[in-house]
Amino acid sequence: AHQQNIMNLRVSEVSQTACSMPIFYVRDGNNGQWVLTAFTSFEQGSNLFIKQGKWTALHTPTNMQTFPFFLMMSPDDPQRYTIGIDEQHEVFSTTTGQPIFETNGKASLHLSRVKTLLESDINNDIQTQAFNQHISQLGLLRPISILIQHKDGSTPSLSGLFTVDEDKLQTLSQEALFE
């Protein structure tokens, strides 16, 4: 997680997360859907909200609470969810740390807690997908590029980011907004 500079958010987390970090929309490269994301750093491989192994932001998004586990669509049935794990990440180990399963084969307390969090997150995921689709259908997303000024004078740019067009948002009727 200390190298994760972008994390997916649920719409229910936006108000709390926006107090600490910038939020943008990006397109999922696999399915083209809009994804609500928070940036923990504008540098890949960096997370400014982890200091000495501890999360320091005011709000801890669900995906940080459950990392390296995550909610995903079932490969066997796209109408169902399942739990995935990032086995390639350095925090995942088969030799050290908390076990996923007890010696009797039952889920560990840690896995049970993560499973409960992820299961309760299914409704948040469904609401977020519906919200993102609605925002897109209303034409409220506009592209934004960010130029970063480094001390050494270099100015890398971030593209592929989208934000809510506040001018368009102000012109919407309440009926359109609350459909």
Language model features by range: what are they?
Residues 5-8, 30-31, 47, 63, ...:
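Detector for Asparagine
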